[in-house]
A protein has these predicted regions:
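Extracellular beta-strand-rich, repetitive "passenger/adhesive" scaffolds
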Residues: 318-321
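Long, contiguous ectodomains of secretory-pathway proteins
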Residues: 1-84, 103-104
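Short strand-edge motifs at loop-to-beta-strand transitions and within beta-strands
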Residues: 96-98
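Surface-exposed loop/edge segments in extracytoplasmic proteins
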Residues: 81-88, 323
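Feature responds to low-complexity, polar/acidic, surface-exposed segments characteristic
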Residues: 103-128, 136, 141-157, 164-190, ...
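A short amphipathic alpha-helical interaction element
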Residues: 131-134, 159-163, 195, 224, ...
Length: 329
């Protein structure tokens, strides 16, 4: 709960205009709202503060034809017209809205990042929007100025870097090297040290991390569960448990993590109801998992509705159950 009240709560979203060059560049003609919460008691309205709590907000929006949903953001506009990009925001296609978590009520709008590299290898890929999502938020970079390499394997060093950036880790806080195979000047070095120190990922031995080794899908599940747990996130059980056709091939140490991440809607199966536990986790799959994680943190119910599995195939979930056959109202 946001707060203890004895009256009715009303969330007000008032369209507003903010004039500054920074707002014009970030938001343009997209919606901007002054968002407030009020308690109504005995006919009197009183403004409500979050007082250290958070609230999930959705701003309805239909992307323009030239806009990529993965590049849409929620932005906060302060009293001086300065824009703060909210990295933990996402355009949810099922809700047709930009969703985000607010720590205070204020002026919020919808921003768009135009400066995303024009990758030549993502246009026809099922995870295109997810890849643009992670790049626009600085979680992952392209493999060149024009390529993302969606089907290339995700290395341990790359993965912990993305997670560290998502967590807002300050690299200067983790400069002391913990592993002999992690060079101090490697881009992933501080994030490896952070991940090992916090228990998100262990080394392959006491002195090695194997940063250039690809992770497989069951390892990705374990790391994501560790990440959520260590950072204090609640892992929801939104979806029914899936009995994958290859469940017997999931390692005993990964079974609980696979189940947990699948029920939360963070990881999914692939073609023919397989999980492919030993298959290499690709950059496209990791981008998809990171975006799902952000959306689940904002609103666990984003696991319902139309969703793609980890092969890009669409399914529909209602109240946590997979809907089979024709859909009707």
């Amino acid at each position: 709960p946001i707060c203890q009240t004895t009256g009715d709560l009303i969330l007000k979203m008032k369209k507003t205009a903010v004039t500054s060059q920074e707002v014009e560049t970030a938001i343009g003609n997209r919606p901007v709202y002054d968002i407030t919460l009020w308690e109504v008691k005995n006919g009197k309205e009183t403004a409500v503060n979050l007082s250290g709590k958070t609230v999930s907000i959705a701003i309805p929006y239909t992307p323009a034809k030239n806009e990529q949903p993965g590049n849409l953001y929620a932005v906060y506009v302060d009293e001086n017209g300065n824009v703060q990009w909210i990295s933990k925001s996402s355009y949810n296609m099922d809700q047709k809205a930009v969703i985000f978590v607010a720590e205070h009520f204020s002026i919020y709008g919808i921003g768009y990042k135009n400066q995303i590299p024009a990758f030549t290898d993502v246009n026809n890929h099922w995870a295109k929007d997810n890849m643009l999502f992670v790049v626009s938020r600085g979680l992952l970079s392209g493999t060149s100025a024009t390529t993302f390499s969606p089907n290339t394997g995700m290395t341990r060093g790359m993965f912990v870097t993305a997670l560290g950036r998502l967590a807002g880790v300050d690299p200067t806080d983790y400069q002391a090297s913990m592993f002999t195979d992690v060079k101090e000047d490697a881009y992933y070095a501080p994030y490896v040290n952070w991940a090992a120190k916090t228990g998100v990922v262990s080394g392959t031995t006491d002195t090695t991390f194997a940063p250039d080794t690809n992770i497989n899908r069951e390892q990705m599940a374990v790391i994501m569960k560790n990440y959520a747990t260590k950072l204090g996130y609640t892992i929801p059980k939104t979806l029914e448990v899936v009995n994958f056709a290859d469940s017997a091939g999931i390692s005993s140490w990964a079974k609980e993590a696979v189940k947990s991440m699948q029920q939360a809607g963070i990881l999914a199966g692939k073609t023919n109801n397989c999980f492919d536990p030993a298959g290499t986790a690709t950059r496209a799959e990791v981008a998809t998992v990171l975006r799902r994680f952000v959306e689940i943190v904002i609103d666990p119910q984003t696991a319902n509705g139309w969703v793609q599995n980890d092969s890009g195939e669409w399914s529909y979930y209602k109240n946590g159950d997979l809907v089979k056959g024709w859909l009707s109202n």
